[in-house]
């Protein structure tokens, strides 16, 4: 019997060590976690671009009631349709990163590439079209500048992809808006 007990202890000892090593490995991996893919530039980009996009939504919301230009109405709708989900994505990243989600900035300041809307809501027709296009061109240029700055410093792949998309899409929209800008 004594030999049988020793034999059983010899067999359980390696199994116990293996179990202990497995538990230690799991704990070690959990403690290490996956490396952060974002940095402060990614957080700053998302925090700045959210209110910037919100201002574009505000501006786009004015278009249907201020102009009858179907091309401008279509452009404003496309801008809003593209930027609404981007706002949601950026706010999601900020929550995931435990970073403050900035309060909506309807102060219309020049910060973060924002533009001064002035009396835009009081205009209509061709006067509105000209002012809206001029402001949205300026607004888009601010977004492109923010995105390019981010590309030089950001590390998160998803955030960098969004910044690249902002540059390519908004540069195309700037060209479109310049072609729509009434002369004179």
Where on the chain are the PLM-derived regions?
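C-terminal motif of bacterial Sec signal peptides marking the signal peptidase cleavage site
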Residues: 28-31
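Bacterial N-terminal signal peptides that target proteins for export
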Residues: 4-22
């Amino acid at each position: 019997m004594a030999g049988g007990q020793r034999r059983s202890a010899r067999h359980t000892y390696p199994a116990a060590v293996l179990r202990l090593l497995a538990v230690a490995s799991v704990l070690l991996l959990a403690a290490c976690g996956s490396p952060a893919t974002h940095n402060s530039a990614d957080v700053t980009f998302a925090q700045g671009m959210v209110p910037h996009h919100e201002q574009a939504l505000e501006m786009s919301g004015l278009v249907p009631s201020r102009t009858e230009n179907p091309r401008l109405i279509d452009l404003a709708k496309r801008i809003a349709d593209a930027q609404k989900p981007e706002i949601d994505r950026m706010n999601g990243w900020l929550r995931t990163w435990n970073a403050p989600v900035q309060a909506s900035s309807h102060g219309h300041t020049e910060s973060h590439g924002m533009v001064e809307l002035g009396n835009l809501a009081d205009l209509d027709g061709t006067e509105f079209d000209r002012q809206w296009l001029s402001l949205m061109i300026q607004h888009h240029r601010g977004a492109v500048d923010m995105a390019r700055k981010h590309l030089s410093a950001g590390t998160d792949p998803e955030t960098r992809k969004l910044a690249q998309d902002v540059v390519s899409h908004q540069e195309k929209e700037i060209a479109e808006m310049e072609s729509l800008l009434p002369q004179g």
